[in-house]
């Protein structure tokens, strides 16, 4: 078990990581000032069926505790569910001293966090992640819902009071979700902890290695990379954009293929490979792209689909939040551990994407 301290301009809080940290929830809630009036747990059907009662039992508090459960899947991070959650909150008499508890993966963390950010102009919430992917999204305060024209386009910055990362919850994950979350671990290693990157290559030969002490080690190394960036740039005006390494193409693939048809991590993995492919050309450096490609494929990450229309993907990349004045801005790598946001012309991206697509066949 280990605590990771997060410090931003707006709030300080701890990430509790370990096999027995769920019991910390009671103390966290009881110690909040002003006192918590009641607790709303937001979850999805898959997670609720496995873990909702466990969390309710762990919450040994006097306050009224109720739940709001949505269907599972990224497409459920919608305005309709956001609105329905507000309705449930009002019907159950949530007030400004209430607490929302986000029980689930990144989708639930984003949805519940945005409900908390907007209900009565902002109430407190706690993240209880149940996926490896959420080691990224649960920390840092970015909360949002999707719009049909783009992912995470409606949202806010709203820091949690705490993050309780009870690792036994992750054991029920299917392989594709382990792979999806591991992509963000790789991202954090590549942009901010080269020592972790080398450790991963040695110690994580298959996704089956992501358990017990190795899992806790990974979380306690990857989360501080995110924490360090967020402490410098809470609202993504500068270096926080570095955390979007691999996401410009990744989000475009999610949008083109349809949310739920490719996991976020699979999209980011393809996006990171493309970013390395393009970085070698832009910076005239050797980043061992071929070795990286084989390493990714070993874990089962997909290739860039050969039947996608490249020009369509370029246009979707221009809808990315980093885009400025209609120009694509990507996070590129000068060397392992050193990344920058770079403006890239449509033509350069198009040519590189075509070459990348052919290389991945």
UniProtKB/Swiss-Prot annotation:
Residues that, per the record, bind Zn(2+): 184, 247, 264
Name the Enzyme Commission number(s) assigned to this protein: 4.2.3.4
Q: Which residues bind NAD(+)?
A: 72-77, 130-131, 142, 151
Task: Fetch the SUPFAM superfamilies from UniProt.
Answer: Dehydroquinate synthase-like
Q: Which reaction does it catalyse?
A: 7-phospho-2-dehydro-3-deoxy-D-arabino-heptonate = 3-dehydroquinate + phosphate
Is this entry keyworded Metal-binding? yes
| Binding note for cofactor | Binds 1 divalent metal cation per subunit. Can use either Co(2+) or Zn(2+).
Entry's CDD domains?
DHQS
Molecular function GO terms recorded = 3-dehydroquinate synthase activity; metal ion binding; nucleotide binding
The protein's matches in Pfam families, at most eight in alphabetical order, are given as: DHQ_synthase, DHQS_C
What cellular component terms from Gene Ontology apply here? Answer: cytoplasm
**Per the UniProt entry, what are the Gene Ontology biological process annotations, in alphabetical order?**
amino acid biosynthetic process; aromatic amino acid family biosynthetic process; chorismate biosynthetic process
| Pathway involvement of the protein, from the record | Metabolic intermediate biosynthesis; chorismate biosynthesis; chorismate from D-erythrose 4-phosphate and phosphoenolpyruvate: step 2/7
Keywords, sorted A to Z: Amino-acid biosynthesis, Aromatic amino acid biosynthesis, Cobalt, Cytoplasm, Lyase, Metal-binding, NAD, Nucleotide-binding, Zinc
Under the heading PANTHER family, the entry gives: 3-DEHYDROQUINATE SYNTHASE, 3-DEHYDROQUINATE SYNTHASE, CHLOROPLASTIC
Question: What protein family is recorded?
Answer: Belongs to the sugar phosphate cyclases superfamily. Dehydroquinate synthase family.
Provide the function of this protein. Catalyzes the conversion of 3-deoxy-D-arabino-heptulosonate 7-phosphate (DAHP) to dehydroquinate (DHQ).
Against NCBIfam families, the record matches this protein to: aroB
HAMAP family of this UniProt entry?
DHQ_synthase
Protein name from the UniProt record: 3-dehydroquinate synthase
Gene source species? Bacillus cereus (strain ATCC 14579 / DSM 31 / CCUG 7414 / JCM 2152 / NBRC 15305 / NCIMB 9373 / NCTC 2599 / NRRL B-3711)
